[in-house]
């Protein structure tokens, strides 16, 4: 998902030219809403040190995950029922903010552990599905919800000629219908 710098983690939490590029793009295309995986390296050690250790495990987002107009998705473990924010268990790998300008990111979380997904069959296995984990498994669930909302919006508003909700409306709907997650 990081289209700017393969293994280069950049400056944590900083609003970069890459972040700005996404915001300019979305500003010029008001129906376009990028959904970006937050990253999976929160507890990864490099040279015997956690990423951005000076921030005590926070402020780990880089590049496109710091953009203002994209929806950034964290990965959580699944849960059977929601009773309160403590019902939601954050994965031990999902990266999170805040950003250097104190915005709260990721914007939302979805199940990212034990997600059954398509798999490339190999010579040793013909199984076309496997269980995976990661923020790249959580982000498609959020994208699917947005697609369902768009479909419902079209069904409700087709008689007046409205085709799609704007990206800002989707983000607002997400923010106002999600339940608090975690005790962080």
Question: Where in this protein do the model-derived segments appear?
Answer:
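Substrate-binding/access-modulating region of protease and related hydrolase catalytic domains
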Residues: 1-67, 80, 100-103, 117, ...
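A general alpha-helical scaffold signature found inside nucleotide-binding enzyme cores
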Residues: 13-20, 88, 165-169
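Flexible, small-residue-rich helix->loop connector segments that border functional cores
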Residues: 27-31, 94-101, 149-163
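Acidic glycine-/aspartate-rich tracts in secreted/extracellular proteins
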Residues: 41-42, 77-80, 113, 179-182
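Internal glycine-rich alpha/beta core junctions
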Residues: 64, 68, 86-117
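Alpha-helical segment proximal to the catalytic Tyr-Lys
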Residues: 73
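Hydrolase catalytic cores
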Residues: 110-184
């Amino acid at each position: 998902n990081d289209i700017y710098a393969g293994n280069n983690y950049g400056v944590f939490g900083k609003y970069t030219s890459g972040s700005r590029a996404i915001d300019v793009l979305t500003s010029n295309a008001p129906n376009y809403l990028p959904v970006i995986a937050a990253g999976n390296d929160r507890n990864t050690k490099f040279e015997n040190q956690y990423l951005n250790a000076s921030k005590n495990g926070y402020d780990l987002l880089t590049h496109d995950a710091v953009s203002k107009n994209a929806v950034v998705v964290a990965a959580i473990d699944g849960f059977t029922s929601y009773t309160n924010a403590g019902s939601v268990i954050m994965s031990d790998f999902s990266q999170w903010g805040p950003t250097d300008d104190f915005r709260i990111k990721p914007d939302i979380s979805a199940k990212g552990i034990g997600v059954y997904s398509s798999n490339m069959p190999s010579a040793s296995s013909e199984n076309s599905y496997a269980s995976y984990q990661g923020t790249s498994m959580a982000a498609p669930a959020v994208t699917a919800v947005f697609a369902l909302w768009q479909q419902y919006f079209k069904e409700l508003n087709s008689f007046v000629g409205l085709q799609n909700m704007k990206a800002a409306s989707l983000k607002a709907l997400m923010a106002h219908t999600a339940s608090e997650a975690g005790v962080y």
